[in-house]
Structure formats: structure tokens, C-alpha cells
């Protein structure tokens, strides 16, 4: 998260109640993972959301699927456009190589 640190917001508990009560429908890129002993987020998944409730809506969809039982926290970067979120997501997947992202698909 070093390059985007000033824009990065997090870490928040990856929990249905937390996300449901989060009053934000902004689009952007989100990071799901666990907080390491050094306080940084170890990223397991990077995703983008720009419609249908933005990041909040996409996180609620992931939570309803209940597929990442080891994910405990999330963070995000708000983006001004869908193109910006697509570019950031792609670059972050390449940079972070998260275990739940399928490499080569963005």
C-alpha cells in the first residue's frame, strides 16, 4: 500500500454488520486480508467496485458468499472513475499477487 498510502483507508473489520452500517457507496478498489503483526494488511484479495452500491455493495456480496473464512479485515482506495479503479486494481494485483485473485484476469 505504500504508493497509495495517503489515499488508503483502513483497516476495518471484515464483518457483515460493520459493512452494512458503513455509509459509503463510493467506487474504487478494496483490499481484503488479515492484519499482520507489524500492523500492515496482508492482502488476500484485491477487487474493484464502481456501481451497485460501490465498495460497500461489493463487500456485502462477498460476505454473503462466505468464501474467505480467513479474511478478517479490509481497506480501500476511492477512485474518481471506473477507468481509474480498473487500472489501480490491475496494478495492485500484479504488485501484491494476492492468493484469492486469479492472475491474468482483471
Can you describe what each PLM-predicted range is?
Residues 26-27, 53, 60-64, 76-106:
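Structure-specific nucleic-acid interaction/processing domains
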Residues 1-57, 83-91:
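GIY-YIG nuclease catalytic motif and its immediate N-terminal context
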Residues 68-73:
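Short glycine-/polar-rich loops that comprise or flank the Walker A/P-loop
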Amino acid at each position: 500500500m505504500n504508493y497509495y498510502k495517503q489515499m488508503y483507508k483502513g483497516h476495518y473489520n471484515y464483518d457483515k454488520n460493520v459493512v452494512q452500517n458503513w455509509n459509503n457507496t463510493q467506487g474504487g478498489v478494496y483490499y481484503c486480508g488479515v492484519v499482520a503483526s507489524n500492523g500492515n494488511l496482508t492482502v488476500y484479495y484485491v477487487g474493484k467496485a464502481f456501481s451497485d452500491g460501490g465498495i460497500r455493495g461489493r463487500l456485502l456480496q462477498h460476505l454473503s458468499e462466505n468464501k474467505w473464512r480467513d479474511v478478517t479485515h479490509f481497506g480501500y482506495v476511492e477512485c474518481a472513475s471506473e477507468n481509474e479503479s480498473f487500472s489501480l486494481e490491475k496494478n495492485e494485483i500484479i504488485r501484491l499477487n494476492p492468493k484469492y485473485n486469479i492472475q491474468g484476469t482483471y
